[in-house]
Amino acid sequence: MITVNVKLPPRADLAAAERLVESTCRSRGLSEGMKTSLKSYPGSIHWHFTKEGERGTIEVTLWKKEKRLWINVHDNRASPWTSKEAGRLKSALEGAIMKINS
């Protein structure tokens, strides 16, 4: 499994971060397949994003309580595009979050 932590500024607007995850993924051509919460991270927001016509899933989790945002690609959901996109998505999210917090 690949896990990529997204750096959040100390005073990040986490309500805006939720919207930014969705809009940033959409702008990168990713489709939201699922939005839920993870029992192991109470109060978290967890998404599955896919790419049309491709196999594989990128998971993104925002845990406001702990001020954490991370991206996962599980081995059973990996494909050639997912590992590359995980790093690119990290950069895109960090840039978008920095813009709204500056």
Residues covered by each model-derived region:
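Intrinsically disordered, low-complexity regulatory segments enriched in Ser/Thr/Pro
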Residues: 56-84
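Basic/aromatic recognition patch in beta-strand/loop cores that engages polyanionic ligands
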Residues: 41-65
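Beta-strand elements of well-folded, non-transmembrane domains
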Residues: 8-12, 53, 75-77
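Short secondary-structure junctions
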Residues: 26-33, 53-56, 99-101
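Non-catalytic effector/regulatory segments
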Residues: 38, 45, 73, 93, ...
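Hydrophobic beta-strand residues in large extracellular and virion-surface proteins
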Residues: 4-6, 21, 58-60, 69-71, ...
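A conserved amphipathic terminal alpha-helix motif
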Residues: 79-102
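Negatively charged, low-complexity tracts enriched in Asp/Glu with abundant Ser/Thr
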Residues: 1-49
